[in-house]
Each structure stands twice: as structure tokens, then as C-alpha cells.
Amino acid sequence: MQAYFDQLDRVRYEGPKSTNPLAFRHYNPDELVLGKRMEDHLRFAACYWHTFCWNGADMFGVGSFDRPWQQPGEALELAKRKADVAFEFFHKLNVPYYCFHDVDVSPEGASLKEYLNNFAQMVDYLGEKQQQSGVKLLWGTANCFTNPRYGAGAATNPDPEVFSWAATQVVTAMNATHKLGGENYVLWGGREGYETLLNTDLRQEREQIGRFMQMVVEHKHKIGFRGTLLIEPKPQEPTKHQYDYDVATVYGFLKQFGLEKEIKVNIEANHATLAGHSFHHEIASAIALGIFGSVDANRGDPQLGWDTDQFPISVEENALVMYEIIKAGGFTTGGLNFDAKVRRQSTDKYDLFYGHIGAMDTMALALKVAARMIEDGELDKRVAKRYAGWNSELGQQILKGQLSLAEIAKYAEQHSLAPSHQSGHQELLENLVNHYLFDK
């Protein structure tokens, strides 16, 4: 089979002085950072959908890309051609993982029977490609939002037959993920929300999606899948308001249905932007709540109100993200999946490499900065000092529930407490972060 990316052998590390646009300047997979290989810290993945399914179309224009597998032809043969190119790309980019939705890799067909048959064939084909290339599956998922049947949601749909179709897709995609050795399974509810409350029963829809997630957990254990289940928060788009708004909202949902020990979150940077949060905030919140799982690494445009899915290029932003992740022990089953796409005007096929190479170098630099922050330990020391009072006898009695509200009030009165405010030193800490970023 003729190579699609025939002008490139493989992207390799050439160092910071390299001027080769098809080489890594900072991402060196075997470089040790805090005693661990860079590749093992970052666990990079490339996504199937933006990279091989999008044709460059937008709300105002038709597709601008010339992709051989997007031409008229027999659907399964085109899907196999797409898989051939995808795995050529994964191998040449030197990413250890990839991610997919069911209908990214397989034609949906005109019926449920066709869907199941097509997907079964493509799962076998993907298994062959994984074995040949050594590329592994970070996570799989089901697309329960694109087809018109999901206009009013999947698990939250007012029609139980639509709910049942979605259940079939999720069961099938979970089984496929398990068969392919996937390390996680993701659930993103793009249509799980509402456009108007005038025709929406919030309590009913919440009960539906809660039961759906409980059944997903039950199925995971039934088939012996050892990976992590992940919900991906997003506040809106395509739905006006989505039920998985942000990390805190997802945690509240999980607690309501007794799922907080079973499901974690896959956090996307651009979704944090849309929710009015920083990427750093969402990562830190997930870690604090004990539900951090994986990351969709990209960036949004703060001047635009939609999901632009651009490649991450900010070392400043991502250094703080990597600092939180590494400090918390790093990824287990999760990783950094590039849920990002080239721009509509980027029609050269090698633009796919330029986008990913820049993103991988960005995250490598961010990791190195995070390592300097951790090794120095100054930020941790200052935070510990700020909360040191809670290690006192009074602080520990409060936290351990040994004092009631009235008893604390009595203590304050008896000891004539008159605490004064201590500086938070925000500006000093911001300067310290800049030191790690820019002073070598």
C-alpha cells in the first residue's frame, strides 16, 4: 500500500536548535523527568474525529480538505483506507495512543443491524492495525449526538426507544474498547441538556441519565473491563445548557446517583473556557474531588463563544496544569489526547503534523517547567505555611468534628480571639512562576 504521508519517515527529536518543522524540538520520549520517561508522563494520543473525519466544513462553507477516504465509494473500504492512513499518521507522529468514537472508524449504516455488522468488522481491522504498529487505544466512546435521532438527547431523550438505541451504541463501543485493550471509556453528553425549559422535565431527564450511567457501570463490571469510565464536562454547544456543565457539576451528579467511586472526568481545556473557568481550575478541582482521570489537550479562543478546538501552544497555561497533575501522582490510565483540529485554511496534509508537533513540544516544555516547580518546592512551602494554623490543636479539633459551632464560638470568646489578615502574596507567587518559566 502506498504511503499517504510519503514525504516523511518519522517525526524524531532533534533538539531546541533544530529548524526542521517536522521534528520535535522539546519532546524527547526517552528523556527522564523526575525519574520517569517523558513519554510515560505525557501519554500522548491523537484523536480520530478531528484528524481524519472532519472535511473542513463549517457553518458557512463546504469541506475544504482533499482526503481520499472522504470521496464517493464503498463505505467499509473507505473506512479501512482511513484506518490505514490514521495508523500511518500515529506511527510517524510517534504517539503511543489514539482515541475514537464508534462512527469515526465505522460507517453507521442505514439500520442498527448494519451498524453492528460494520463496527464489528472495523474493530477487527483496528486490532490488526494496533498489532502491526504498536499504537494502543487510550479510550473509545460512542457518538450519541450527531444522528438526528439524538436531537433531544440520548439518555435524556423523551423517547425510551432513542434511549435504547443509545444504550446499544454504548454497549457495543464499550465492548469494542475492551476488546482493543482500551484503557478508558468516555461518555460525553453533547445533547444531554435542553434548549428551552418550556418542554423539559428536569427531574425526569436527570433520573434517566442517572440510571443510564448506573447501567454503564454495571456493564463495565459484567464484561470485566478494567479501564476507567470518564465523563467529559461541557457547559453548552451543541445544546444550550448541558447537564455535565463542569467538574463540580459532574461531581454533584455522581454523588446523587452513588457513582463518585466509579466514574472520573476527562477534562478538555476549551470546555473549561466555555464554562467560564481556567483549565487550571478544572484540573485542580477534579484532583481535589478525587475524580481526575484524563485530559483533552487543546485551547479555545476567549473572544469566541464556541468550541474552536485549537492546538495548545501556551506553555504558561499548561505548566500549571502539568504541575497539578504531576504533584497528584500523574496519569494512571489517562493521558493527553489532542482533541484539536487544523484550521479550515490549513489544507496541506502535513499541517496535521505541524499542529500535533507544536502541541507535543508545548506539553513537553510545560512538563519540564512543572518539574522545576516541584523540585524547588517553594510554591508548596508557601501554601503549607498559609494553612499552617489548621495543624494547631484548634484547627485539628474543628476538622475532626470534636467541636460544635457553639463550642467554637465559646472558644473564640474565652480566648479573646483577634486574628489579623495575613498577605496572600499573589504578586510574589506570580513572579515566582515566571521565574520557573523563563529563567533557565
UniProtKB/Swiss-Prot annotation:
Q: Which GO terms describe its cellular component?
A: cytoplasm
Q: Which residues are listed for Mg(2+) 2 binding in this entry? A: E268, H271, D307, D309
- Which residues participate directly in catalysis? H101, D104
Sample GO molecular function, one term: xylose isomerase activity
Entry annotated with the keyword Nucleotide-binding? no
Please give the biological process terms from Gene Ontology that the record holds. D-xylose metabolic process
What does the record say about how the cofactor binds? Binds 2 magnesium ions per subunit.
Subcellular localization(s) per the UniProt record: Cytoplasm
| Keywords attached to this entry | Carbohydrate metabolism, Cytoplasm, Isomerase, Magnesium, Metal-binding, Xylose metabolism
Catalytic function, reaction form: alpha-D-xylose = alpha-D-xylulofuranose
Binding of Mg(2+) 1, residues: E232, E268, D296, D339
- Location (main, coarse): cytoplasm
**What's the EC number here?**
5.3.1.5
The coenzyme or cofactor needed here is: Mg(2+)
Kindly state the subunit structure of this protein: Homotetramer.
Q: Which family does it belong to?
A: Belongs to the xylose isomerase family.
Task: From the Swiss-Prot or TrEMBL record, give the protein name.
Answer: Xylose isomerase
Which species is the source of this protein?
Enterobacter sp. (strain 638)
